[in-house]
């Protein structure tokens, strides 16, 4: 089509030039009206009108009939012929090539545009991996994405905060985000700039470890396999491990304890208990020995006083046991585990069923407090109790009977530690115990809760001192149970597989302990 257009334009231009030349040389023969034949444009005006008779020769091809008038076409000149031949040659050679090239480019662009639209509509399938006989899709990698930040972040933050103008705090936050690199750190080996940071983190982590606990393992405390063994031909999913969670202690723990126990202000016992759990390391002791540092640990143990050694092996030690330990000599052996197994015979640890209670023959009532039949330890209770002890390094002793009562509370419709019903649940247990039994059951927890000097004053003989001591020891027992139930409540919702059904967890306003991963 374009070639035909070019030919027509060339013909019109050539005819116009030739006609204009003839008009200048010869005066045209005028007709009846002395007018011109009207055509569209100026070309028609330049062609003269001639009135001719009809040609008698029907084969004469030199005339063009137009009604009663006819226009005579002069034979084309040589210049006209050469122009037509030249134009046609260009169109047939280079012109057609240019037209074909332009058409090909247009087709390529349209195909690319169509392909782009199609690729946008159809997502790219992620690669699959065969896991347990099933095809699983790999999740997208966040580090492949680019985080974009708006230029009007301060204004957006001000609008969301419902303030008129961006404050200094909002401007600083926006500036910090704009300069921050949100990309993940590469998984490869760290460079020299990050090596010091990693070393600092490792040093800070090691400060929170007990040096001797790294090498000491109790053969009776085995890690529970959290992966179900009954999963067949499926991708097994391990249950969450509580020891991977961080225990957070509230700053207002003394006031929360006073609120729970119906006190107006926190007592000395509540303040001491809050101080104990704030400084306590809830992480469980590592399992299994480390042969690389056994020798250094042995040398460290024998270079320290005996009282420090006892506190390394077990954080909860009876006062008279420490005195007896100081009179004995610990002989160096080839493995630190021997010292843990030997001391397990007379040093209590933060576990129960022979673990939380000293096994000394002089100690009475080593099986825990007396409870009702419904609160006695069963197979389920012992299983949950063992998992609870292995999940944390407990700040106080925990007996299976106490765990049984806590299980009954957590299975209720109202089980939140913020509810004061837990005090009523433990009331029959605490109020039944007398001073000698409380002293044995609380053990070294008494010194933590009451303080060494206060404990000496309370344990003096006399009826008045006896009543004051009984009241204080019962309060200490309530405080200990309140703290332990908060930790047990968090544990139960992490290990909900132990229970058939639990009510939804309550987001507590007032709390003492919480777990955060």
Swiss-Prot record:
Chain ranges for the short sequence motif RxLR-dEER as given in the UniProt record: 50-71
UniProt biased composition (Basic and acidic residues): 51-73
Region spans: Disordered: 50-73, 351-376
Signal peptide feature range: 1-21
Sorted UniProt keywords: Host cytoplasm, Host nucleus, Secreted, Signal, Virulence
Domain of life: Eukaryota
Locations listed in the record: Secreted; Host nucleus; Host cytoplasm
General function of this protein: Secreted effector that acts as an elicitor that induces cell death in host plant cells.
Protein family: Belongs to the RxLR effector family.
Domains as described in the record: The RxLR-dEER motif acts to carry the protein into the host cell cytoplasm through binding to cell surface phosphatidylinositol-3-phosphate.
Protein name: Secreted RxLR effector protein 95
């Amino acid at each position: 089509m374009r070639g035909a257009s070019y030919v027509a334009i060339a013909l019109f231009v050539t005819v116009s030039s030739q006609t204009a030349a003839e008009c200048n040389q010869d005066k045209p023969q005028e007709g009846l009206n002395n007018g011109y034949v009207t055509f569209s444009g100026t070309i028609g005006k330049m062609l003269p009108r001639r009135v001719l008779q009809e040609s008698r020769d029907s084969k004469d091809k030199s005339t063009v009939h137009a009604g009663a008038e006819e226009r005579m076409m002069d034979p084309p000149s040589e210049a006209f012929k050469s122009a037509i031949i030249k134009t046609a040659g260009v169109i047939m050679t280079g012109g057609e090539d240019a037209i074909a090239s332009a058409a090909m480019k247009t087709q390529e662009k349209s195909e690319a545009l169509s392909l782009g639209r199609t690729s946008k509509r159809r997502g790219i399938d992620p690669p699959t991996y065969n896991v347990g006989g099933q095809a699983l899709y790999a999740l997208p990698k966040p580090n492949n994405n680019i985080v974009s930040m708006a230029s009007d972040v301060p204004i957006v933050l001000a609008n969301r905060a419902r303030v008129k103008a961006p404050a200094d705090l909002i401007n600083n936050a926006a500036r910090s985000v704009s300069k921050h690199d949100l990309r993940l750190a590469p998984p490869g080996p760290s460079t020299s700039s990050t090596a010091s940071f990693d070393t600092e983190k490792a040093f800070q982590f090691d400060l929170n470890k007990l040096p001797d606990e790294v090498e000491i393992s109790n053969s009776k405390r085995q890690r529970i396999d959290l992966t179900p063994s009954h999963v067949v031909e499926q991708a097994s999913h391990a249950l969450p491990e509580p020891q991977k969670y961080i225990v957070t202690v509230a700053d207002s723990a003394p006031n929360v304890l006073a609120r729970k126990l119906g006190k107006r202000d926190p007592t000395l016992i509540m303040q001491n208990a809050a101080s104990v759990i704030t400084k306590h390391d809830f992480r469980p002791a590592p399992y299994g020995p480390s042969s690389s540092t056994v020798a250094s640990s042995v040398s460290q143990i024998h270079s320290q006083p005996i009282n420090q050694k006892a506190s390394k092996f077990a954080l909860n030690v009876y006062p008279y046991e420490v005195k007896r330990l100081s009179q004995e000599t610990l002989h160096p052996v080839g493995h630190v585990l021997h010292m843990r197994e030997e001391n397990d015979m007379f040093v209590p640890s933060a576990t129960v069923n022979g673990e939380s209670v000293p096994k000394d023959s002089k100690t009475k009532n080593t099986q825990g407090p007396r409870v009702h039949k419904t609160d006695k330890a069963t197979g389920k209770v012992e299983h949950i109790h063992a998992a609870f002890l292995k999940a944390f390094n407990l700040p106080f002793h925990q007996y299976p009977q106490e765990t049984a009562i806590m299980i009954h509370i957590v299975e209720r419709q109202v089980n939140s530690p913020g509810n004061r019903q837990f005090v009523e649940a433990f009331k029959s247990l605490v109020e039944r115990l007398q001073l000698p039994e409380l002293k044995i059951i609380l053990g070294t927890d008494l010194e933590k809760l009451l303080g060494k000097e206060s404990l000496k004053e309370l344990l003096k003989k006399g009826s008045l001192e006896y009543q004051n001591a009984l009241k204080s020891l019962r309060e200490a027992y309530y405080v200990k149970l309140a703290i332990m139930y908060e930790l047990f409540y968090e544990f139960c919702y992490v290990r909900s597989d132990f229970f058939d059904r639990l009510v939804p967890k309550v987001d507590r306003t007032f709390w003492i302990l919480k777990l955060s991963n």
